Amino acid sequence: MRLLHPLIPASLLLTLTSATLHTSQTNTTITLTNNRLTANFSKSQGRITDLYLDNQDLLGPQSGDTGVGPYLDCYCIPSGFYTPGSTSPTLQLFTGTDKSGTSYAGVLMDETYPPTGQHFQQYWFLRDGETGLHTFSRLAYYNETTPYLRNLQEFRTLFRPNTELWTHLSSSEVQTAPLPSKKAVEEEVVVQDATWTFNNTPTDEYYVQFADYFTKYTFSNAWRDNSVHGMYADGSTSNGSTFGAWLVMNTKDTYYGGPLHSDLTVDGIVYNYLVSNHHGEGTPNITYGFDRTFGPQYYHFNGGKGSTASLQELKSDAETLADPSWNVDFYDSIAKHVVGYTPSSQRGSVQGKIKLPKGATRPIAVLTVDGQYFQDNSVNSSSYQYWAEIDDSGHFSVDHVKEGPYRLTVYADGIFGDFVRDGVQVKAGKKTTIQETWEAESAGTEIWRLGTPDKSSGEFRHGVARDPTHPLHPPEYLIYWGAYDWQSDFPDGINYTIGTSDPATDLNTVHWSVFGPTPNDPRVEYDTTHDWTINFPLSEDDLAERSKATLTIQLAGAKAASGNTDVYNASEPYTNLALESYINDQAEPLTLLIGFNQSSSCIVRSAVSCYQVRSRMEFPADWLKVGNNVLTLHLPYNATDTETAILPATVTGRLILPPQPIYGQTPVILSVIGSEKLEPLPAASILIFEIIRHQSEPLWSVPRSA
């Protein structure tokens, strides 16, 4: 491991006696320490309560659930949130030497939640010579009296400091910003659940440099693109020494949702979100026999006494560890301690070559549970997942794959649809070889397309375009949907013409049924939002001898009344939501029905790629005509659902949250259910229009498993 830090002083070495790892325990605590990192565990709380790097306190004083961690937390008991270890934990200390001769020590927190029998385990391991903690998290359920308990809605570990040491947070190059100051937080104005503005502190560095609004979703990221995230201390509160605290996703095979899954990363807390449905992917059910060990991941702490390394230097140091091959021998050595971890003796590899369609960019190969759409792999709670970028020659390779059957999915920017092959068998100690040709789907001669098939709606207005009003220029979609004004952007609604309109400005990144209110505007708009008009010309040659036409619509995310829960509610009129497409003056629409179990949350949770929904719809070619044609995309007029949420409102001072949830109406195409509350959200993103000479291919859709 590359260290960027100077040696610690001799006086400190004398205090610790040597560079060898040490452990100690009393009736109330366990301590793990090497020559640089020290972790103290509370036996009564089942978690870390003190953490030091080069004698620098990384956590600060404990106050409730702050000043602690990494620790395990979940939304998984019948009533919702629970912190494993808070009832009656037992802690066990491990010590040993791995295959390389390096000493290690570990702590296991073990607890059974009495009302349900859910069994929780959290593991932390410290190796000599490293400045971080390897973590595994386990949940097991073997209660026959209640075979189905609930869904595992959130399962996460948190590094949750309570100190002014940390000055910046970072999840990507465009998601790096100063942390809001204590004064800004004290005077913040709530504009939506988990969303604030700092307009009462206009000189705050976050407000000046990054955005007017702060939400935990601003720093969320897709797992394909995210391997390291965390916080940085610039030395201003630590005598000039810089520090970093990073979650390193060195393995991703025990998460769910594939590379499109996106989640919270850092917001003053450094998260490891093992399971959640924040952006609409499914979550596993906790049923009799559920037994899942997540990990390993690695909380890495760097910089230290005398360090002047920059944020990017410390983050780059952490990124060198974000590799599944890193520390494999160590993980094999501790497998005897970690229930449910799959050692390398039970893993193989996959190598493949895919002949890609013309125009494919950023291709990726994904291995997930056999027989299921890759975003739905949580339907098999024991499933594993892997992916690899495909190079320019079509080659990819994946190592350390758990033995078993897999589905191979290949997708790429610029190509509609996916390549899918089931039955890929991986055997322990063996290499599986794949060679395939991906033929791009087609229903005939493509007449026009609007948008880029990249599983995102970011190319449209207020998507990935960079904010011009702040020096750090974050992508606009990351900031907060209420920062923008539909009525200023589209006073007459959407009226788009193929060939002349600009998708970056003339089409919105989200199709609202109803928009508003926002913090700056109490108005609610629904007359210009629900219908979008797409104009397109056709010539005689386009229509000559054509009998059938096909409209393909691909949505980067869609919101129905079910939000993120996948729960059908018969009392809600829009539990299933219809996006209707009207061709010219035809009275009957083509209907894309978004099921209650396909609903997700994107734009109010600062994302433009969520659970994918698509359909190919045939219609008679005589619905079309020579000259201008009109496609109307129709959402229900002023469609809302009843939600429990903090809703946007015009605010002039600080809003204090009441003890009970606020009830209100929010847009059906702009609302979402989170782990405990609902919030607002988007719907339409990408279109392609095709005409064929004879019979078109069958209708195609991606049903989502419950």
UniProtKB/Swiss-Prot annotation:
Database matches in SUPFAM superfamilies: Galactose mutarotase-like, Galactose-binding domain-like, Starch-binding domain-like
EC number(s) recorded for this UniProt protein: 4.2.2.23
Keyword Transmembrane: no
The keyword Cell wall biogenesis/degradation is assigned to this record: yes
GO biological process: cell wall organization; polysaccharide catabolic process
Domain of life: Eukaryota
Gene3D superfamilies: 2.70.98.10, Carboxypeptidase-like, regulatory domain (2.60.40.1120), Galactose-binding domain-like (2.60.120.260)
Cellular localisation: Secreted
Cellular component terms (Gene Ontology): extracellular region
Keywords annotated in UniProt: Carbohydrate metabolism, Cell wall biogenesis/degradation, Glycoprotein, Lyase, Polysaccharide degradation, Secreted, Signal
Top EC class for this record: lyase
List of glycosylated residues: N27, N40, N143, N239, N285, N380, N495, N569, N597, N638
GO MF terms, alphabetically ordered: carbohydrate binding; rhamnogalacturonan endolyase activity
Biological role stated in the UniProt entry: Pectinolytic enzymes consist of four classes of enzymes: pectin lyase, polygalacturonase, pectin methylesterase and rhamnogalacturonase. Degrades the rhamnogalacturonan I (RG-I) backbone of pectin.
Protein name as it appears in the record: Probable rhamnogalacturonate lyase B
Organism annotation: Aspergillus niger (strain ATCC MYA-4892 / CBS 513.88 / FGSC A1513)
